[in-house]
Amino acid sequence: MEIVITPTKDDAARIAADILEEYAREGKTLGLATGSTPLGTYQELIRRHNEEGLSFAECQAFTLDEYVGLPREHEQSYYSTIRREFTSHIDIPDEKVFNPDGTAEHPGQAAQEYDRLIVEKGGVDIQILGIGTDGHIAFNEPTSSMASRTRIKTLHPDTVRDNSRFFNGNESQVPHHVMTQGIGTIREARHLLMLCFGENKADAVKAMVEGPVAAVCPASVLQLHEHATVIVDEAAAAKLEHTQYYRYALENKPDWQRF
């Protein structure tokens, strides 16, 4: 696991965009996340597409999750969200952006089919991730199995409450079930790119990076991955104990060693 500490989340977004640009230029498969954390990175990639000609035409992409029962046309579906925030602004073909089907007649079966589709398409080359304040990744809440596959999960009441801000503050409008890639599925991506910003993420970052690998902190599974990059701003890194080494390692990184 490589830890990159940046002064601000804008600096982090630029580094993340540098990493993703390499994959885009090679036509690789991207794993996309929604939420506020990757927005700066998406905006920087959109800028490079518009101003520098960065193309995503040869790429394909998979999203992490979707609400169960929410039509994809709904503005808060993750199908709509990823297009509104990123993919509709670049040249990746829409038919090459794959999403879980939250309105499938048989959601459990659809989850298994999505898991198989990822494998059939060659797997994910780089997966963007964010971390919840409780250490969750995607919708894998604490105590999720580290071997879990794409499946249906019941949202924690706190998650429903948090997400109600996207539904005019009305918790009754927030779906209580989601289809999410499992931790085992996510682990199969060849490169995990974790972005963490803000002091409210400091405890989760500490648990993920320097705590034990445990189901109570799903993100701690990154410690077992052969190629994980964690980019944090100063606020999110505030509780890490080994920042001196993380900074030293980055400053002395050989030119030939990519992120």
Curated annotation (Swiss-Prot):
Recorded catalytic activity of this chain's protein: alpha-D-glucosamine 6-phosphate + H2O = beta-D-fructose 6-phosphate + NH4(+)
GO biological process: carbohydrate metabolic process; glucosamine catabolic process; N-acetylglucosamine catabolic process; N-acetylneuraminate catabolic process
InterPro entries the UniProt entry points to: Glc/Gal-6P_isomerase (IPR006148), Glucosamine6P_isomerase (IPR004547), Glucosamine6P_isomerase_CS (IPR018321), NagB/RpiA_transferase-like (IPR037171)
Pfam families (alphabetical): Glucosamine_iso
GO terms assigned for molecular function: glucosamine-6-phosphate deaminase activity; identical protein binding
EC supergroup of this enzyme: hydrolase
Catalytic site: 65 (proton acceptor), 134 (for ring-opening step), 136 (proton acceptor), 141 (for ring-opening step)
Recorded superkingdom: Bacteria
EC number: 3.5.99.6
GO CC, any one term: cytoplasm
Annotated disulfide bonds: none
Sorted UniProt keywords: Carbohydrate metabolism, Hydrolase
Pathway: Amino-sugar metabolism; N-acetylneuraminate degradation; D-fructose 6-phosphate from N-acetylneuraminate: step 5/5
NCBIfam families hit by this protein: nagB, PRK00443.1-4
Function noted in UniProt: Catalyzes the reversible isomerization-deamination of glucosamine 6-phosphate (GlcN6P) to form fructose 6-phosphate (Fru6P) and ammonium ion.
Stated family: Belongs to the glucosamine/galactosamine-6-phosphate isomerase family. NagB subfamily.
Protein's name according to its UniProt entry: Glucosamine-6-phosphate deaminase
Lineage summary: Bacteria, Bacillati, Actinomycetota, Actinomycetes, Mycobacteriales
The encoding gene: nagB
